[in-house]
Amino acid sequence: MKVLMVEHFLPGSVYTLELCRALRTEEQITIFCRKGAPRPLEGVQWKDKLYAGGKGRAEALMRYGGGLLALAAEICTGHYDVLHVQGFKDARYEIPLYCKLKRHCGILVHTVHNLLPHEASPRDRRLYGDFYRVCDLLVVHNLYCRQLLMDEYHLPPEKICVTPHGSYTQISPKEHQLHTEKTEFLQFGVLRRYKGVDILLEALARMTETQRSRVHVTVAGQQFPKLDATDYAALIREKGLEGCVTLQLGHVPDEALDALYQEADFCLFPYREIYGSGALLMAYSYSKPVLASSIPAFEEETDGGCTGLLFPPEEPD
């Protein structure tokens, strides 16, 4: 079976690499990705023709459009049995493209990492709904997302496949001894308001000085002002947390990310909402205990708190 896997966010999307590593023994896999993204993966064909970013606005639009034209040509001429879409760089253009080209592929599959953008407008809801209805199969990672799709878009249950998020096999957790002087906590991922970094900082501010002297928290990840304009550095200073919080903004390379997880005693997820979290599975892959808010996705993915400590959402205490 010929499968075309479309992924805009390689090489950062370890999930897609792991999926293709598993599928390649049974299927003929081609990954359509952005320029410079291919990684050594025996048995997988790469086509890096999508826009990789980093140009001026006019040239960026031309290169982005050129990448979509190349993708359309691949779908129309590649004779693929399955077109598997992992995500969108700009759904406004890509969803109509997939809907129009569906007749050129056997089965259209989409992994629903996020049911909707976190700041979804009514137009977004209609756009994503159109795409979900056109797809032949939707893959979700928990029952919570399956039910949301059925409730929001009235999709039949047989169209939605619940496949638990796999662990990251490239990770080799080292034997770890808990820190005796200060317990190390880590919150990793792109900074967004729904991830509750402000809740975490307020919780630390409510601790006594003696309690804070025994902990150290690292908040690491990229921050895009259009998605979250909060000045977390100022918030840390305002709450007097400079001595126990390290804010590490920007892209975290693989080696540095590995060091962050290896060093952590616990991983933190004080989220307000989420459809599913790859970062939570990353923590599990490193054999790290997790502290997470008791929102539906985390309730399910921690087996009701059996594999993680849960606390009420938006509750610093």
Show where each model-derived region lies.
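N-terminal subdomain of nucleotide-sugar transferases
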Residues: 1-38, 78, 295
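Glycosyltransferase donor-sugar binding loop
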Residues: 36-37, 216-230, 250
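Donor nucleotide-sugar binding/catalytic pocket of nucleotide-sugar-dependent glycosyltransferases
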Residues: 133-151, 155-171
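Conserved donor-binding/catalytic core segment of Leloir-type glycosyltransferases
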Residues: 178-195, 201-204, 217-220
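Nucleotide-activated donor-binding/catalytic signature segment of Leloir-type glycosyltransferases, i.e.
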Residues: 230-251
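Conserved acidic donor-binding segment of nucleotide-sugar-dependent glycosyltransferases
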Residues: 304-305, 309-316
